[in-house]
A protein has these predicted regions:
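Active-site entrance/lid segments in N-terminal catalytic domains of soluble metabolic enzymes
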Residues: 1-167
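Residue-level detector of alpha-helix initiation sites
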Residues: 24, 174-175
Length: 310
């Protein structure tokens, strides 16, 4: 068993969180990650409703035995924080408040009996979330799928580990037992894993996304803002999103087109023109596999590798 701060604090057996991927990580995915020994986080995106959260929470709770976690986009709560209320009503164990200053919301998370964690992309982010009183941080590197920063996982992880007394998890490019073993050996308390789970049948979202990920290599991603602009998603400019390349990115990435032009060309139902957010570990996803099987394999292989040196 891989014992860390994360496993001891949550009472889980695998030091792994399933990433709260908006539009992809619902109750089935989260529940299966939890049932396999980690903790799956439901992605509470700004377009989700309290009714959707309640329904997905019930699924995750039944599959995972009651343990729940969620991830929210902190910047979106400034205009409307009712989604946080809906999350806390589900009595989660962990709430991830990322991409912005969580200070206004951490006390509410703690009052609800949950741990507050934050993904960070720079040391400046670290100082902000430390001041906010979070319980742990996730050093998320540029390799990660979806929205992320611009520093690679290993450089960022090392700097964060040397700069804080908070428990630190790692995210970005971790899609196998080798990846988990590497960050644990570096001093992380666990990993946040997303891309490795994206081809699992438990994900929500378009069917073509799983097929495209399995067919992709690790060179088939691009860090871009065109999909946010095409869908009128008001993400702060400092966070682009890593997605699989397709005809749409070939035509529009880096072109400087206006939102109306980008929106007119976008079609989320067409794999050539829709978005599939995924990280540089895409080349490690070679088939569609159940999420629980993936989590168990990652844990087993990481333990085998670490035992060689322990």
């Amino acid at each position: 068993m891989l014992e860390t701060w994360l496993t001891r604090t949550l009472g889980v057996t695998v030091p792994l969180l399933g990433a709260p991927m908006g539009g992809r990580a619902g109750g089935r995915l989260a529940g299966e990650v939890t049932r396999a020994g980690g903790l799956g986080l439901i992605g509470a995106a700004r377009y989700n409703t309290p009714q959707w959260l309640a329904a997905e929470s019930a699924v995750a709770r039944e599959l995972g035995g009651g343990l729940l976690g969620f991830g929210l986009m902190t910047w979106s709560l400034a205009a409307d924080d009712s989604l946080l209320d809906a999350v806390l009503a589900e009595r989660p164990r962990v709430v991830s408040l990322s991409f912005g200053d969580p200070a206004p919301y951490v006390p509410r998370v703690h009052a609800a009996g949950a741990l507050a964690i934050s993904q960070i992309n720079t040391i400046e982010d670290l100082r902000i979330v430390e001041a906010a009183g979070v319980d742990a941080v996730v050093a998320q590197g540029h390799e990660a799928g979806g929205h992320t920063g611009r520093i690679g996982t290993l450089p960022l992880l090392q700097e964060v580990l040397e700069s804080t007394s908070l428990p630190v998890l790692a995210a970005g490019g971790i899609a196998s037992g080798r990846g988990l073993a590497a960050v644990l050996a570096a001093g992380a308390e666990g990993a946040l894993v997303g891309t490795a789970l994206l081809a699992s049948p438990e994900t929500v979202g378009p069917e073509y996304a799983r097929d495209r990920l399995v067919a992709a290599s690790s060179t088939d991603t691009v860090y871009t803002d065109v999909f946010d602009r095409a869908r009128h998603q008001p993400w702060p400019a400092r966070w682009g999103g890593r997605a699989l390349t397709n005809d749409y990115t070939a035509e529009w990435h880096g072109r400087g087109a206006d939102e109306e032009t980008l929106a007119a060309a976008y079609d989320g139902n067409d794999p050539r023109l829709g978005v599939v957010y995924a990280g540089e570990a895409a080349g490690l996803v070679r088939e569609q596999r159940p999420a629980g099987e993936i989590v168990r394999d990652i844990a087993t292989r990481a333990e085998e590798l670490l035992r060689r040196f322990g």
